[in-house]
């Protein structure tokens, strides 16, 4: 027994007023999963009908907590890397010559291997390949140089050869001593200069780098050198404002020494978040609602009032026949407690979540349940004025239930004078003839419910989030007041509650009126807590914008459907009684509360990157129509989604809305101007600027068909042949003469194929030594090097595919232009033992494909030009400098305990 007593946890109760039955404890993420399940039940009713005629969709409820953890992981990721040496931009291929080598731009060589082969009939693959190539540029150039290796030469600091970005060590063994000395002298001249960037000492040197990569590096360096000091001040100032609103102190522990002279700091994200970025996402209102619940809603318990309240008012007699007395001792089931959760979710998200009544024949047959719900429903909910917690149907059903309760003469008979309309509550009751018409719902004025004659939406001091400036004031309670449950609510009241007491007294319901008088402090504490939760904890970028909030009620009444339609949840009649007898008492602030701004910034930044990608991809069809003949906007939407972080996709698709997004939604989102500034967005935009030249992506439309004989030189002087460094390539140095080029469009090719003359026409052009260009289609280009005869499929490959077949007595031809094109370099190697005709064949070998790209991918250079590409200015931070990413400081610090908990 002693062991059992030790294991039993002690229940700590804060004040005597809070004594009661604790039903359950709900945290923000748990409630978000519950809300998501309930919301999905409603959403699926529409979606399932639609999907019966289309494809299947996975309707499993996602794990919100895992999604939040993944987004936090995204915030910790760096879009740049810190390295000691830059990547090799140029390498050299040794030939048999002692004074000539082939210099290869490794960027183009690596870029040619990125992505899939482009075809005309797979636009989604084309879009995906473009994104992969753009991300390759961004990733390749996003580096910061730190602690580069150097050496001392005659009192000067000189860069080590591997820092220069040129790989030439394989060339040195074949060079003469004179050439090696010349290169060594050039290396000794790579002096490190001392520079000053943003009051920080840095090393400056000249190195080699490919143009697209250097653009990204230069943009990143410019971002760092701009210091971002004002952005940091704005972010910290905004966090302090938000902390004041949410009762959280901002912690500056990360920022204690970032201003020291030995520290370089990078701010990758910014605050505040542009809310327009989050709310512009198509069909995102439900996802944003769930994120608001998961990141902001506190953990709480459902507290029952002091049981003596009902015992001395409703059940004081031995025999009790009234509806309230009958329900006093009832115990809720699990399903009814779920309905209580729905009711409190609807109260915390007014207008966004509205309630309707379940069709439950059992409860409809129980008049006591309906009548009690009709009374407490008018005291729990707001129906009109500025917002509503109810549908019009539920408000009318509550009016009918209240009407039945007032006319149920179970104690003493009371005089009733009926009105002429026959509407619910159209009568006067009691000796003083109280007019009950005022309790009939009127959504225009809020009459009959909590919004009656109260200011329940207020605009006062500017809120941190510019899109949500409203303050909710249920029952006219100001959320700035401090709540002491033992005394709060005593002597407080509001119009609807007063009128309900007057009407109950007029109807002869003295016991019930006494019960509600005793419940008034508990009732006011309930709504004071809800007001504080809404106006403090739930204030977030995921909060519904004011313009949408103000339009919810008029649209609901008019039956108009807008971007943010309310979610309707069904509750039972008896759950209204249980909700009235329980109050949501927050016990712990949400654990995500202090990191929520960082999560919001990461999410908005990723959305902005996606939008920039989609904007550029949407232009592709106009720039290159031949390769995107069958393209639709949905293709680049899917391509961007597939290459986006899983966590961001999961947030966007919390309610499985992606299956129902149409082209109008997508194009509207793409054209909206809102973006969230961040380092990742800056680098992505620069990568797209570099990718505007498609030749930098190793894509080209300058592919020609021309019959050319593979060179077979005589080896009369082998030494001279080796010194020249002889090689052959199908890469053109200039496009062919335009009067010798025949432009073959798809229409011409189809016409000749239908006439059965396609091959013959091409053969005639080849015999005339002319050139054929097949349309303006973009092709994937690969770069390959050979020191022996290349395979025949490369040598004799054609820049198109032409297939014919016969079926049913008819001939069919298939023509495709978008094929993979290979730029090959054949390096001739000979030995002194070779005879003059060693390279000569009886029958010549022909090559059929020629490519022109206006880039210096490979060039033959003399040994003295090996280091001629050192023309880029690099900035490197000294080894004793610290590089800090202070993005993680953009989160609030310690949550303050509520003064009354």
Swiss-Prot record:
Location(s), subcellular: Virion
InterPro entries per UniProt: Inner_layer_core_VP3_Orbivir, Inner_layer_core_VP3_Reovir
Cellular component per GO, a single term: virion component
Pfam families from the UniProt entry: Orbi_VP3 (PF01700)
UniProt keyword annotation of Glycoprotein present: no
Sorted UniProt keywords: Virion
GO molecular function, one term: structural molecule activity
Family: Belongs to the orbivirus VP3 family.
Function text: The VP3 protein is one of the five proteins (with VP1, VP4, VP6 and VP7) which form the inner capsid of the virus.
Protein name, as recorded: Core protein VP3
Organism taxonomic ancestry: Viruses, Riboviria, Orthornavirae, Duplornaviricota, Resentoviricetes
